[in-house]
Amino acid sequence: MGLALHTTRQDGRATIAARGSIDLHSSDELRSRLTELVDAGERAVVVDLTAVDFCDSSGLNVLVRAYKHARAQNATLTVTGAYGRVENVLRTTGLDRFLIEGPAEEAPADGR
């Protein structure tokens, strides 16, 4: 399965809903979209991974570089909706500490 991206704007933020796999073959498309949004002046960008079933190291690299690019432009980039293998790889690599978005009321009681 490839990668499909759908961008919406609401409440001062742009959300990219990704569907499919983020891997070596599809990560450039995500990188381009994220860069375009930040360069166009979006100050809050969210990547919704709810419908993403796989993310390899090239996908992680795109997310890290986009995060750094956003910070350099005084913008934010966060990830939401990660679950299963995708959430596990974000947590294992430590990227969850600065990428995963979630209001306090959604956080588990044990603080994870």
Residues of each region from the PLM?
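STAS-like cytosolic regulatory interaction modules
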Residues: 1-53, 65-112
